[in-house]
């Protein structure tokens, strides 16, 4: 230890062993989140959980309302180019705490976005392991004997960075969200649209969290909410969100938006086949602006706008 070095470092440097020593997919995994006080988490970020604070160094790699962060940082600090390279949806879903860290020297894993042997925040690659975005009930109790072969998510990051969850639903606070971590979409550009078909190997994901801060713990293992899902075409949804965003700024989305989805292992948007709802057509999101997907007709636009207006007025 160097002279003058603080002995009470919050994140002490650890020696990272070789990956092969503990790379056992069937090993029993203990839950790092089983001891989290849910009451304190629900007040986050105003009353943050001491456990979640241990991951504070990773917050810069996790999603939030970038619009608010940009305005807050305009007074002085500029975002690091290194951090910007880690802020894409592709990296967060398929690389964050999944790709093995290539650094040879010992370092603090709580400050590194890559995976290390035995660390608590490690994630399974959803492209290789078929598990859903639903929290594992056994893991929430403390451990899961199935380990990496489990069909459910283990921990906060596996749940909320799962491709079927991450930014597939709008944040109820919209652009007014000021939470340090938020896995929901704050603008239509952030919203990830998934095909409306269910993959039985991956299961379903539940609706919008009951509390905006409840996303900081693993979602409970419970059936989806009873409120009926909105079922217009995806193009109508995007266009309606644009209208609400232009009219109300940071509008509040009061009702959960759920859908059974098939997990595409890419953050790029893919063609959506016609489903059981009327007035839905195939379209390519990558080739045309979202506003062009709305079918023409004053009645359809008026109906969609009135529906969203009624739902938001109830909140």
Curated annotation (Swiss-Prot):
GO MF:
DNA binding; DNA-binding transcription factor activity; RNA binding; single-stranded RNA binding; zinc ion binding
Can you cite an annotated GO cellular component? cytoplasm
Keyword terms, alphabetized: DNA-binding, Metal-binding, Repeat, Zinc, Zinc-finger
Instruction: Spell out the protein name for this chain.
Output: Zinc finger CCCH domain-containing protein 23
The segments annotated as C3H1-type zinc fingers are 131-157, 165-189
Region annotation (Disordered) maps to 1-21
Task: Determine the domain of life of the protein's source.
Answer: Eukaryota
What the entry lists under PROSITE patterns is as follows: ZF_C3H1 (PS50103)
Known PANTHER family for this protein? UNKEMPT FAMILY MEMBER, ZINC FINGER CCCH DOMAIN-CONTAINING PROTEIN 23
Q: Does the keyword Nucleus apply?
A: no
Tell whether Metal-binding is among the UniProt keywords. Answer: yes
Q: List this protein's GO terms for biological process.
A: mRNA destabilization; regulation of DNA-templated transcription
Q: Which Pfam families match?
A: zf-CCCH_4, zf-CCCH_AtC3H23
Q: Which residues form a coiled coil?
A: none
